[in-house]
A protein has these predicted regions:
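Transmembrane alpha-helical segments of multi-pass membrane transport proteins and ion-pumping complexes
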Residues: 1-9, 28-32, 53-65, 85, ...
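Short helix-capping/hinge motifs at transmembrane helix termini and TM-loop junctions
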Residues: 11-12, 39, 68, 124
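Alpha-helical membrane segments and immediately flanking helix-loop junctions
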Residues: 15-44, 50-51, 55, 70-108
Length: 124
């Protein structure tokens, strides 16, 4: 969310555009509700969430290799929190522990994003 705030300030996004992008790293079902509640454009939020998931799925394993992340728990949490359900599919390909941790991180990220997005929505 901090990245979205900085990008919004740099590119002078409106409040509506800003809150549209806030829920980019949670599942579509939760993200749609957050975007709608904060006054964002739900259809764009859905597209951004899907793009985030696909991009995270494509580069997630590569990023773990670059930064020498070998721990199964860390890989799962990274993929789940960054690329949500699509990342969890990738994590399950890597292993059972990665998949379990990815699923758990989706839930935790969802709850934290719902709470923090209310606070972050006030910044712009």
């Amino acid at each position: 969310m901090g990245c979205v705030l900085v990008m919004s300030l740099v590119f002078h996004l409106s409040h509506e555009e800003y809150v549209t992008l806030l829920p980019k790293s949670i599942t579509t079902a939760i993200g749609m509700g957050v975007s709608e509640e904060l006054g964002g454009i739900v259809t764009i939020t859905v597209a951004v969430i899907i793009i985030t998931g696909v991009f995270g799925n494509i580069i997630g394993e590569f990023v773990c290799k670059i930064f020498h992340i070998t721990d199964s728990v860390a890989k799962g949490i990274a993929l789940g929190s960054a690329a949500h359900a699509i990342g969890t599919a990738k994590a399950l390909e890597l292993g059972e522990v990665e998949g379990a941790m990815s699923g758990l991180s989706i839930a935790v990220s969802g709850v934290l994003t719902v709470i923090l997005s209310i606070l972050f929505a006030q910044f712009l």
